[in-house]
Curated annotation (Swiss-Prot):
Chief subcellular location: membrane
Gene symbol of the encoding locus: ttgF
Highest taxon, organism lineage: Bacteria
Pfam families on file: OEP (PF02321)
Membrane topology designation: Lipid-anchor
Gene Ontology molecular functions: efflux transmembrane transporter activity
Keywords, sorted A to Z: Cell outer membrane, Lipoprotein, Membrane, Palmitate, Signal, Transmembrane, Transmembrane beta strand, Transport
Induction statement: The ttgDEF operon is induced in the presence of toluene and styrene, but not m-xylene.
Residues annotated as signal peptide: 1-16
Name this protein carries in UniProt: Toluene efflux pump outer membrane protein TtgF
Record's subcellular location: Cell outer membrane
Role noted for this protein: The outer membrane component of an inducible organic solvent efflux pump. Involved in export of toluene and styrene but not of m-xylene, propylbenzene or ethylbenzene. Is not involved in antibiotic or AMP efflux.
Amino acid sequence: MKTHYLSIALSVALSGCSLIPDYQRPPAPIQAGWPQGEAYAKLKAGTHRPSQTRDAELNWQVFFRDPVMRELIATALNNNRDLRQTALNVEAYRALHRIERSALLPRANTGVGATRQRLPADLSPTGEAGIQSQYDTTLSMSYELDMFGRLRSLERAALQEYLAAAETQRSMQIALIADVAIAYLSWRSDQAQLDLARSTLASYENSLNLIKSSREVGTASALDVRQARSLVETARVQQTLYTRQVAQDMNALQLLLGTKLPADLPISDVLDQPLAALSTGLPADLLLHRPDIRAAEHRLLAANANIGAARAAFFPSITLTAAAGTASHELDGLFEGGSGLWAFMPRINLPIFTAGRLRGNLDYRNVIKDINVAEYEKSIQTAFREVADGLAARGTFGEQLQAQRDLVDNNQAYYKLAYQRYDEGVDNYLAVLDAQRELFAAQQQFLSDRLNQLSSEVRLFKALGGGWDNISSQPLTAQN
């Protein structure tokens, strides 16, 4: 134990009275490059351009080209309640930092006092009972000499917690931008699904009426009528489902906006507008561009500083207190000659026996740092996985959408041919119903795939730390 304390004391002397452990950023537990394989083989050249070209591309006002979507995102950034809470958290941590920083400076107080008391005879210096008065005015100052860096360590920890809160706010803003974009895309996509269900229902109802007429003249069977009615009810279910979904999408979007949707919101072709191209850089760039990773590192730095404060608690604390002023038995005598007073009170506190409290506190701070290391590494791994998922989606959705578009075109041709053969008397109407069903399913799937493709691009934008006009390429400092 003595050797342990001696080594700490020696390290204090050699490091300028700071007991904060030397910080070394943990190595990123991810591979140097993005995944390779069939899902990534068709990515366009330039996808992994160096990170210095990415700041402008990650500006959300550039990435989202639809003016209506940009307007909604701006509204959410001004009104969202979750974002407002994170902003208030930043202010709270800023105030805590000011509290810890104030401990590094001397404290001064001034006061004016008056005392009037009756002393019994046995306590009176004259041997007679009497009433005494005393008036005083003082200016006092106290200052703790931070010889072992305890106060400085606490101030640094508070600063890092404040910076972590600021990065968390940035992360929340990026998440909000992505959530609003996806919610708006989902709303418009479900409106398109609802329009498709309505038009398909009308088509199925016309087919049902036609088959009923054929049934009356004996050219269609009861089975034909039942099959046609089944398609009508299926389309009616889809219409009801998407009517509900559109309403729920609007509710979700309004919650994100923090206010009602504008009544005059124009209808845009957002589902047909491609988003701006993104370059991903290298995995190491995530350390600079993801605010959640930077927040995790700030929390790790705070835990590291708290270890310094816990170490310093083993050593003496020295407090200097001084006071000066005047005192008199008469109020008008406070500023007469000979009424001055002063006091100087240095104090040294040395922990001798704390029943293991200091050792337990140091062990606790070391464990908290290990926890923060694990959280920092997990945030990097999570970011890597999110970007890799986005790249896999980008590498495959183009082909999937084209295949689904070809399927829709084929089923439209199939439907026209089936109806032509029915009109010519070659086939019965069941072939037409089957073609209608296949076309409806293909159109629905295309709308779903298109939404998923756009949503995956938005998630990739979020995973890359997008959303800010100027994303610092360096860790935040006190000046930031």
